[in-house]
Regions:
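N-terminal Rossmann-like dinucleotide-binding module
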Residues: 4-30
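Glycine-rich phosphate-binding loop and adjoining beta1-alpha1-beta2 segment
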Residues: 24-58
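Short glycine-rich, flexible loops that bind phosphorylated cofactors or substrates
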Residues: 31, 87-88
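Short acidic low-complexity segments
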Residues: 62-75
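Redox-cofactor binding/interface segments in oxidoreductases and associated redox assembly factors
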Residues: 74, 80-81, 144
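Rossmann-fold NAD(P)-binding glycine/threonine-rich loop
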Residues: 89-158
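Internal, well-ordered domain-core segments that constitute the primary functional module
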Residues: 129-200, 206
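Long, compositionally biased stretches enriched for glycine and/or charged residues
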Residues: 180-429
């Protein structure tokens, strides 16, 4: 049977939804799912909900749990990582502390100081997991959901022999957002994109049934500058392609939308209190899950929705020799011709008997490729700083970021964030 290990299962909402996806994937019946998390209480809650889901659907899934990933990896076929060291407190620090130095962004999990320190906390753990996989399950596929996606996947590819892909729901969310503008249901739209995670650009958008090219309609809507996603539509007007990922993510890559001149994001409806609201929402969802786990009469199937993620479907395809096409983060190696070969890029990928293969796509417009290339160099500095624990490289990652206006402030910010993250930065001690 297929053995799937979910590391970070205590990221409760994601963990439960991934279990739900697996439960409802017919081709994975008989599989063994191992839940792993260092938070024993959260792990037990997710395990109880998973047990409910399996029983309600008679899913024939074997479910087990443990707190140490090293105990779970032996013989695994797939290892899914959804880890976020430091939790909500670290995430809030990633956004709030830099704001005092003029770094204004919403999500803060990909680029700049927030992305850097999430990388410094997370990359060593995921690389350690991959190194353990080299001994315990060398042929397994690592499927990463943790952010910053590009940097984490690059670190695994660069410093281990483990095959790794990264998955994100950005394109699905974009299709859902633009479908009302096109007068269609999301299911009526087929879209593909390329770029880097949280900064991919729609290359194709067609009607799923008729094959009609929907890009001209999207361009026409952009001329009216809709109030929803004004940054994305502004970029469509500028570059001729529509960026996927949502404005809250996109502004981490392009600093002027949250500059003082743009009212710190107000001119483009960017909410700099995004993280506080997200943390409050997560807390509410967690309370609902705790109730679901502890009240026998509540049905898990009625309460849990799937993720719109593709991990379960990809595992089904790979395990049962099916062909599917998905958005994946993989090493570039020429797939996007005008981006660095060693970079991790997000492109369509096809499941094959030998794994998930990213497809060759067209070169991106020069203006977009130039921005992405600068980001790729920033990610490379994050990887090196995280793996080697070098403050100098972390500073260089800050200095290359377009939000940085002062070396002195960048050094002060770096010291403050290192101190705030001290429990999670073993490599800097």
């Amino acid at each position: 049977s297929t053995k799937i290990v979910l590391v970070g299962a205590g990221s409760a909402v994601v963990g439960v939804r991934l279990i739900s996806d697996l439960v409802f994937t017919e081709g994975l019946r008989g599989s063994h799912l191992v839940l792993v998390d260092i938070d024993s209480e959260r792990l037990d809650m997710v395990y109880r909900i998973g047990t409910k889901l399996i029983a309600e659907q008679d899913a024939k899934l074997r479910l087990s749990k443990c707190e140490d990933y090293r105990e779970a990896l032996s013989g695994a076929d797939y290892v899914i990582t959804t880890v976020a060291r430091g939790g909500a407190g670290a995430w809030l620090n990633d956004v709030r502390i830099p704001q005092a130095y003029g770094y204004n962004y919403a999500v803060g999990d990909t680029m700049g100081p927030g992305g850097l320190f999430r990388a410094l906390r997370t990359i060593p753990l995921v690389v350690d997991i991959a190194r353990e996989m080299e001994e315990a399950c060398p042929d397994a596929l690592l499927i990463n959901y943790s952010n910053p996606m590009t940097a984490i996947c690059r670190a695994v590819n660069k410093y281990t022999s483990i095959r790794a892909i990264g998955l994100c729901h950005g394109l699905q969310n974009t299709v859902r957002r633009i479908s009302p503008r096109l007068g269609l249901e999301p299911s009526e739209i087929t879209a593909w994109a390329s770029g880097i995670n949280h900064f991919i650009w729609l290359t194709d958008i067609v009607h799923s049934v008729t094959g009609e090219d929907l890009y001209p309609k999207l361009v026409e809507r952009a001329k009216k500058m809709p109030s929803e996603q004004p940054v994305a539509y502004d970029l469509l007007n500028t570059y001729g392609l529509f960026p996927s990922g949502g404005d809250d993510h996109i502004v981490e890559f392009i600093q002027y939308y949250t500059s003082h001149e743009c009212g710190k994001g107000a001119a483009h409806n960017i909410d700099l209190n995004y993280v506080e609201k997200a943390v409050a929402h997560q807390k509410q969802e967690l309370e609902e899950l705790e109730k679901l786990a502890s009240v026998p009469s509540l049905r898990a199937t009625d309460a849990i929705q799937g993720t719109a993620e593709s991990a379960a479907e990809i595992i089904d395809c790979l395990s049962n020799a099916k062909t599917g096409v998905f958005m994946v983060n993989v090493p570039n190696n020429g797939r996007i011709p005008n981006l660095p070969a060693e970079a991790v890029v997000e492109v369509p990928g096809i499941t094959t008997p030998s794994g998930v293969m990213g497809v060759q796509v067209e070169a991106l417009p020069l203006g977009i490729a130039g921005r992405i290339t600068a980001c790729i160099h920033e990610f490379e500095l994050m990887v090196e700083a995280a793996v080697h624990g070098e403050r100098r490289l972390a500073l260089q990652a800050l200095l290359i970021n377009p939000f940085t206006r002062s070396r002195v402030d960048a050094e002060r910010l770096l010291d403050e964030l290192i101190k705030a993250n001290e429990p999670y930065l073993e490599q800097f001690r």
